[in-house]
Every structure is written in structure tokens, then in C-alpha cells.
Amino acid sequence: MVSEIIKLIEEGKIEEVLKKVEEIKGDAQLEIIALTLIEKGYCDEAVKVAEKISSFGLKDEVLRKVAIAYIENGEIDKAMALVEKIKTETDLEKIAMKLIEIKKYREALKVAEKIKSRAIKEGILMAIINALLDELGK
């Protein structure tokens, strides 16, 4: 079933993919489909598939990968909307670091606000400070 769906993704038959996804219950299968959608540039559809994943950790991981794809495509608002759905702090940290990489410091701070772990927050803040110092040094 998954290989059939991946073939449909490669053929660009996304509406068919979303219909077939309704029949799939396994988180691992949903993850593979979502990751394939991300890889092929269908991020909005990947979010729909990811939201069907029942394991919170796995769902957050896939949503993080979509958020990073959005950031790489310059769709910061969509990435920030996904941040609201993600609870796993290490996934939030990776999103913040990606934002810092493209000099979106305010957005990275907004992500950091959602994190309870002091160590992770400090890591993000230090990364922002170092990035700003690097900019000043140029």
C-alpha cells in the first residue's frame, strides 16, 4: 500500500494520495508517506498526513521536518504556525536553530519561549548571540 502511495506522489496525484491515506493506520507508514511528500515539495499535504500520526513524538518529528522545509522555502509564517502544534522541545530547538541559520532571530526567540528546558533555551539564546556577534564582526 505504501509503495503504491509513493508512486502516486511521484506522479503528482496528490488528491488520490490523501484519499488513500485515510485507510492507513500505522504510524510508521504515515511517516514514510509524509516524508516522501516533504521530499517532493508537498509540505501542506505532509502536514495533513502527519496529523494522523498517533504517536506524539513521531508526529512532532515529522511536523518539525515540515517546518524546516517551510523555512528553507521562505515560508516562515507556515513554519511558525506549525511550531504551535509541536510539544517536543528538541524538535522546537532544531526549528529555532534553523531560523537562526537564516537570521530570523525574532522568530527563533518566539520558538524558544515555548521551551521549558533552561539548557535548551540557553543554547538557543547563545546561538543567537553568537550569530549577532559574527554579523558585527564582519
UniProtKB/Swiss-Prot annotation:
<dbReference type="InterPro" id="IPR011990">
    <property type="entry name" value="TPR-like_helical_dom_sf"/>
</dbReference>
<protein>
    <recommendedName>
        <fullName>Uncharacterized protein MJ0659</fullName>
    </recommendedName>
</protein>
